[in-house]
C-alpha cells in the first residue's frame, strides 16, 4: 500500500524526460560522473600525501648542509 510500484516509477521517469529532455539529462549525468571521479581522485591524492608525510625528520646539521649545497648550485647557475 505505502510502496511505490514499478508503474509509478516509470511514469515519473517519463515525466522527467519530457520536462528536461534527453540532452539535458545526459549532460547532468556526465557532470555528476565527472564530479564523482574528481572526488575519488582527490581522496586518493590525500591518502598518498599522508604516506609522504610519514618520514623521519632530518637533523639540523643535515638541513644546513643541504641548504649550503643548494645555494652553491644556485650561485653557479646564475
Swiss-Prot record:
Membrane-crossing residue ranges in chain numbering: 1-21
Membrane topology annotation: Single-pass membrane protein
Location of the region described as Disordered in the Swiss-Prot/TrEMBL record: 47-78
Ranges of biased composition (kind: Polar residues): 60-69
Quaternary structure (record): The Tat system comprises two distinct complexes: a TatABC complex, containing multiple copies of TatA, TatB and TatC subunits, and a separate TatA complex, containing only TatA subunits. Substrates initially bind to the TatABC complex, which probably triggers association of the separate TatA complex to form the active translocon.
Annotated family: Belongs to the TatA/E family.
Protein's UniProt name: Sec-independent protein translocase protein TatA
Organism: Vibrio vulnificus (strain YJ016)
Amino acid at each position: 500500500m505505502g510502496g511505490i510500484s514499478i508503474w509509478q516509477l516509470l511514469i515519473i521517469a517519463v515525466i522527467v524526460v519530457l520536462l528536461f529532455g534527453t540532452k539535458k539529462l545526459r549532460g547532468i549525468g556526465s557532470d555528476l560522473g565527472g564530479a564523482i571521479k574528481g572526488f575519488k581522485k582527490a581522496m586518493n591524492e590525500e591518502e598518498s600525501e599522508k604516506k609522504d608525510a610519514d618520514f623521519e625528520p632530518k637533523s639540523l646539521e643535515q638541513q644546513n648542509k643541504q641548504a649550503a649545497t643548494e645555494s652553491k648550485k644556485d650561485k653557479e647557475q646564475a
